């Protein structure tokens, strides 16, 4: 397809541009990400999603490069390198009224909800201008105006998202609640309690599992009967 060749040219140009000055400032200078809509087709969706994935990867690589040399970041960081596709897809599907609750690798989900990058970097550097005044850091960052919430680990986002979905249903307001978690979270009892309650009450909730097959060093098939979470 001709548009694939155009996409390749765009990737080469963008990568060359970003390599000239890889820092969090260079990421911000590229401007805010503008999501496409489900009505867009073919080339538009492919280019937009790839742009989102590439920019998120470069964002993370910039943080890796700055993390230890700068020694100014006041928090531990869990990177989402290699897991850019799911946030990119969510950026296409989610609407402003939807809630998004993240696992501990928050940057991609923060990005997917369109929250401001300046406030993300300021938060990581412990600045008062950060999304949470520099008090939350990378893992626990939230941006209430964008309806994005971090601060959950080990299936915690699942229960919180279920509560938000119940609130939406009770108030009869638009939007859905989205819970992001890894396949390791499905080993937790809280996960099964949340999905059981969501099913029983028909809550407006979407469960998004990022399956990288490992919970720290434990292979999934040594912990679970199948690697198909939906089937399980």
Regions found by a protein language model. Give the residues of each.
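N-terminal amphipathic, basic-rich helices that act as targeting or association modules
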Residues: 11-105
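Cofactor-binding active-site loop characterized by glycine-rich and histidine/acidic residues
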Residues: 61, 70-201, 219-226, 230
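Short, ordered loop/turn segments at secondary-structure junctions
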Residues: 105, 210-213
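Active-site flanking residues adjacent to catalytic metal/cofactor-binding acidic residues
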Residues: 182, 209-210
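A glycine-rich helix N-cap at a beta->alpha junction
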Residues: 201-208
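Short beta-alpha connecting loops at secondary-structure transitions
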Residues: 213-219
């Amino acid at each position: 397809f001709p548009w694939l060749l155009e996409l390749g040219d765009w990737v080469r140009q963008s990568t060359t541009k970003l390599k000239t000055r890889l820092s969090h400032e260079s990421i911000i200078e590229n401007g805010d990400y503008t999501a496409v809509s489900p009505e867009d087709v073919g080339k538009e969706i492919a280019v937009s999603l790839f742009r989102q994935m590439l920019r998120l990867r470069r964002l993370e690589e910039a943080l890796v490069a700055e993390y230890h040399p700068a020694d100014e970041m006041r928090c531990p960081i869990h990177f989402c390198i290699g897991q850019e596709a799911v946030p990119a897809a969510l950026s296409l599907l989610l609407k402003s009224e939807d809630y998004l609750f993240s696992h501990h690798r928050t940057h991609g989900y923060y990005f997917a909800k369109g929250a401001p990058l300046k406030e993300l970097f300021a938060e990581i550097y412990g600045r008062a201008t950060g999304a949470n005044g520099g008090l939350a850091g990378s893992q626990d960052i939230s941006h209430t105006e964008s309806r994005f919430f971090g601060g959950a680990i080990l299936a915690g986002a699942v229960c919180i998202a279920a509560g938000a979905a119940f609130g939406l249903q009770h108030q009869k307001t638009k939007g859905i609640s989205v819970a992001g978690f890894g396949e390791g979270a499905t080993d937790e009892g809280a996960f099964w309690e949340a999905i059981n309650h969501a099913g029983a009450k028909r809550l407006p909730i979407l469960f998004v599992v990022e399956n990288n097959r490992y919970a720290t060093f434990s292979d999934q098939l040594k912990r679970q009967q199948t690697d198909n979470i939906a089937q399980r």
